[in-house]
């Protein structure tokens, strides 16, 4: 689990379609003042885990949570790790994700490596983001939480060049 924990949505029902809205996720931060609003004292400080990731449509929730963490921690937020139903991944010493097991895959959402930018636009405030790096982990892949490096069969993957992307002309 995470020191910073997702504890559901702030509305009364589980609404994944609201996940990209600002403050739609109830978070327990590691630095919370009260026992009931603080994440676990053990667990990852480099990742925020979200369970049933694909099954319950939680990509938007994870994106907005990591954007909020980016703001909260001054641009040095943790990665989001989306683990699907009946799937698991080993977190070794809060440094390495490896040894995926189960029925599906794991997504890693990273705002820092490509210097993602984001803002909350419209009413209700909805996340708009650019340069968010997403890795999909399957058997034989690892993710170094310290270096923010994805590897397949022990070979690091090249970090994409985000400057090559341009806004489409309409």
Residue ranges and their predicted role:
Residues 1-3:
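Beta-edge loop/turn motif
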Residues 5, 10-170:
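C-terminal and late-domain segments of enzyme folds
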